[in-house]
Structure formats: C-alpha cells, structure tokens
Amino acid sequence: MTTAFDLVYVRKEEEPILAPPRRHGGITAWLLDNLFSSVTNAILTILGIAFLVWIIPPIVRWAFIDAVWSGENRDACLAPEAGACWAFVKAKFAQFMYGRYPVEERWRVDLTAILLVVGLAPLAIPRAPFKQANILYLIVIFPIVALILLTGGHFRISVRSAVLLIGFGCVATGIIATMAAREAAPAVAGVLAPAAALAAIVAAAAGQFANLGEVSVFGATWPTLDAAAAALALVALVLGAAGILSAPGLAGARTAVSLWVAVSALVFVLSVLAADFGLPPVETPLWGGLLITLVVAIVGIVGSMPLGVVLALGRRSKLPVVRFVSTVFIEFVRGVPLITVLFMASVMLPLFLPPGMSFDKLLRALIGVTLFSGAYMAEVVRGGLQAIPKGQYEAAQAVGLSYWQTMRLIILPQALKIVIPGIVNSFISLFKDTSLVLIIGIFDLLGIVQFNFTDPNWASPKTPATGYVFAGLVFWLFCFGMSRYSIYTERRLDTGHRR
C-alpha cells in the first residue's frame, strides 16, 4: 500500500545552470524577434538590405545630389551628369497648382482652399465642438461660397427659372396642405395655392414665345410676363403658407412646411448665385492642375457616398421596381470603364440635348465621375449591410422603429463602420482616376504636367521623369493621408470588443 510518505522526492544532485533568458527589449531583441528569428527570415532580411543598398544610393544621387535646383531654361538641365530637373518644377509650379487660372485672381483659389481646411480640420478632430454647425457649413455654405469664388458668380439665372421653382414648391405645399386639412378654410387656401402657382408657370412659359414689352417694378426693368409671373408666384407663396399653417393635420403640415422652406431656400441660393459680387468671371476651361484634381475628387467623393447608400438600399429593397432599377444601374455602370462614361458625358450627351442647350464640360465630367463612383460605392455599402445580423433588424422592429429610422439609427452606422476600409479604398481609387479627365480635354495635375513637357524652353531628357515624380509625390501625399486617417478612424470606432 502506497502512502504519502512514499511519494516524497528528495533531490540528491544540483540542477544544471540554465543559460540567461533572451532580452525582451531594445533594438537587439527586436531584430532577433522580427528580422532574424529563423534562417529563412535572416536570408530574406539580408536580400532586402542588399536590394535597398543597390537601389537607394542612385535615387538619392539623382533626386538630391546631382539634381538641378535653379535655372532659367532647359540649358540648366542639359548637363550629362545632371539629375532631376527641379528647376522645371519650380518654374511651372504655379501652373501645376492653378492651370491657366488668371494670375491676379489666384487669391480666390487660395481663399477657397483655406475655407475648406477651416471646415475640415475641426471635423477631423473627434473632440472638436460644434460638429453639427461644422457639417452645415461644409454641406451648405462652403459649396456656394466656393462656387462664387472660383467662377466669379453672377450667373445668368432667368426669372422664369426661379418662378418655376417657386411654383413647384407652392403646388407641393398646397396639395399636402389640402390633404392635411380637415376644415373648409385650409382646403380653400390649399386649392388656391396650386392654382396661383400654375398660373405663374403658364405665364413664365408663355414669356418664352411672346414679347409683350417691359415693366418697371421696384426700380428694376422686367419683361411684362416675368413681372406677372413673379407677382402670381408671390401670391402662391402666401396662399400656400396660409394653407399649410392653418392645416390641423400636424404630420401633413410639417411635411408641407419642410417642402416650402426647402424651395424658398433654393430660390434664395439662386438669388445669391445671380448676384454680382464684383468678381471677374473665370471660365472653367481656364481651370487646371491640382485645382481640377481636387474639384473632381471632392465633388465625386461627396456625391458618390449618398448615391451609393441610396443604390445599396434600393438593391436590397423589397419593391421590385426599385430593386430592378438600382440593380440595372449598378451593373451597367460597373460594366463600362470610366473613360467610356467620360467620353459619353462629354461628346455624346450634347447630341441628345435640345438645340441651344448645353452643359459645361467640367460639369458633365463631374456628373459622370459621381455616377461611376456611386455605383462602386453601392456595392461596398451593400457588403456592409449584408454583414449586419438579422437580430439587429428584429430588435429595431421590437422597439417600434420604422424602416427609415431603423436604417438611420441602427443599420447604416454599423454597416458603414464595417466597410470603412472599402469606402476609403474607393475614395483613393477615385482620387487617382481623376487623371482620366484628360481624355475629354480637361487638364488636371497630371495632364498639365504632361502638357508642359512640350514647352521648348524646358524640353530636356530629364524633364519628363522629374515631372512624373512630382505628380506622383502629390498623388501619394493625398492618398497616403486618406489611408492613415481611415486607419485612425477604424481603430477609434472599433468598440466591438472593449469592456
């Protein structure tokens, strides 16, 4: 029988002394753990170091040591031992940034860039206050100010255009007010508003084909029918406001007020764009360089994100028509290259417009880039929506949320957080694809760099390589910045496993 005393073990010799443990800190430990942890890793590390030793010295010598930093023309870069011709970049730097934008008006581009940075910087800092006001500034105020600064404002907006918009708003508000009304008086006001707005629209349309003289109103000379249309539109606004404000149906009244305010705000924006601020007009064909690159990229990014969300929701919709239209649009746009979309928008679209009607070439490019990027963004967002478990939808239904409340408060925040890498990847791809607008004659940064290669004052064997390196560095700075900020945002929002 074995007892506890029999299991006692007493060592009769000393334990051999072990080697000291490997250090867990310092550069030596890091090298051993990461670069020389095995024979294979050691061989790969040595080969990598050899490659860097082989490639880096020539690059440094070409870009810095033997580079030409100053000069008046191509003669400075024709020496056989000369490296990069940075004198060419220095001489053409302003053109690379602004294109052919007038020199005396380039302060407007600088001011626009400053206003953009002022709006983006607080938005990019998580702890910065007044986020809602900042978003309102970037979405509403900044685009209007930037458009006026870059173009000069004073757009030729016909009175008829404003009247048509006012009439549309009055018709919408009047109809909703009538539907929301429960008594006779609001109903009458709701009927009169569309009637007055319809009369204003007819008067404005008739002015296209008749010339009945002019009339002076408040010191301004208007065509007679324009003045009549404006007066009828004013009556329609008053009657529409009376109808929606007196309607006892609260939900309908709120919707009508929202539409009425939105149309009134749109008319105000048109009035601001039509105002003369004393700025000389600058046509978009004079834009170029980094200005065009940033305009196309920012408009494409801002426009493609909401478009992609709408298309993704439409493709997952239970309504057959909505799902079919969204699917056809996404698959059609994804099936053609961006060059084809830009070519169609620039060359083919004007052929289908009525005689005398045309769009600015840059505007057509912006629309094409936005639609193209929106189709790809839709698939990225749809991937995030499919990753949300069904229990999230059921939980939202259990607390009584509607479909749009569920999407806005529960589903979309989680889905967008999941696909942050895919979203930023689409943004980076869009930023690099802006160089394709050169196909339709718009000179972005890369296009203006290539265009200056033909300048006889700077034509040399070193000029093209230097220009491409400069353009590549600019693209890399913006793309790398977006990539790093997306990683920071992804880590900041990664709260799934925190306690």
Task: Mark where each language-model region is.
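Transmembrane alpha-helices and adjacent helix-loop boundaries
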Residues: T2-R499
